[in-house]
Amino acid sequence: MKLDFIENYKAYTDKYFLRSKSILEQEGINPLVRYQVFTRHDIPSLSGIDEAVDFIKEKGRDIRIYSLKNGDSYKSGEPIMKLEARVQDLVDLETVYLSIMSGALTGPIDLKLLRKGVRASYTASQGKTILDFSARHFAPELVDKIARICQEEGFNGTSTDVGAKYWNTLGGGTTPHALFLTIKARMEQNGIQGNPTAEGARLFDKYMPKEIPRIILGCTFNKEISDIIETAETGIRIDGTRIDTCGENYTEGSQNIILPKLNVNEKYLRGKGVTIASVWGLRRGLDQAGLENLSIAISSGFDAEKIKAFVEADRVYQNEYGRELFNVIGTGSFGLKNLIMTTSDICAYFNAKKGLWLPMSKVGRFELPSKRLRRKQ
């Protein structure tokens, strides 16, 4: 008997990947792409890799798999795996293969301790909309259980259908980097001018039901402010933006932001990734462009301590400007210190007209060298 998360893997998949696949299928966009998988931990003996490969082999189609194997040692930042296939054959597999790897690498989870982290995150959110984005970080068999805990502790929703039943709804989400990178690959290959973020927003609005909020990811090309302004200026419907700037980058404009005195840990104020300065700059930039109506969703490492710091910044921002700094929090680690989270990113695409692989990644996540990977399929 097959495990449910293999047989019904789409129910365990972050909804934005399923929506992206639907958009790409309907628009006929299907370049050959390369993904890379890595983690930021040194690991003496890998686990879960062979099982993830088996899942990809079973559910994928015409996918070239290059990977390390269970038992191999691993150094932080090197590739664990690379995958090559048409994007429509890969994009909806990501959540589950990461879940298989992350779950095995982390090992057993104390659900009582996890519940404490969920409760602390909810309490820290102080009434903000807070969503469970944890599916890729935990073993597939825990996704349903964790979603239930989140619902019981007050969260507003989750990213997977298997978990969303506890809210009597379906999984929700925004838009992923993969959608905009795929669109950029198509534009590059065909010599099409334009903004991939704006084009992704246009296609999302074209194909997705009108009741789904148009929350557009703005950090793919490290133009968190200007890409969203440019998208809105085209007249495309956009309801908000999500900021998920990776730890390799400073958010656009954040280094020039002057912050008031804030009673929070300095590590949350400035630096790379999603910081208070980056969200402050994004809100001010959108407002100054006349886009006060756009909501802001924040994600990337938001445990209870980080949420509390951002909520304090929101309080100060509201006192100064009379409106919220941000509106929605996406979280998934819940403060658990032993989590080993794997990440998967598009890093290249095959340009058929030129007959060669070309770099294609979100800014800061360029392709990593890989001498130890071996072909599995």
For each feature predicted by the language model, list its residue ranges:
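Ordered alpha/beta subdomains of enzyme catalytic regions
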Residues: M1-P209, D287, Q318-R323, F334-Q377
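Structural preference for beta-strand elements that scaffold enzyme active sites
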Residues: I130-D132, L170-G172, P213-I215, I238-R242, ...
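Active-site loop/helix belt of alpha/beta enzymes
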Residues: Y268-I276, W280, R284, A289-I298, ...
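Glycine-rich beta-to-alpha transition loops that act as phosphate-gripper elements at the mouths
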Residues: A135-F138, G218-N222, I296-K306, G332-F334
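Catalytic cores of alpha/beta
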Residues: E224-E233, F302-E320, E324
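Conserved catalytic-core segments centered on acid/base and nucleophilic motifs
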Residues: Y74, I80-L83, L294-I307, E312, ...
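Glycine- and Gly-Pro-enriched alpha-helical subdomains that act as flexible
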Residues: L170-S278, L282-L286
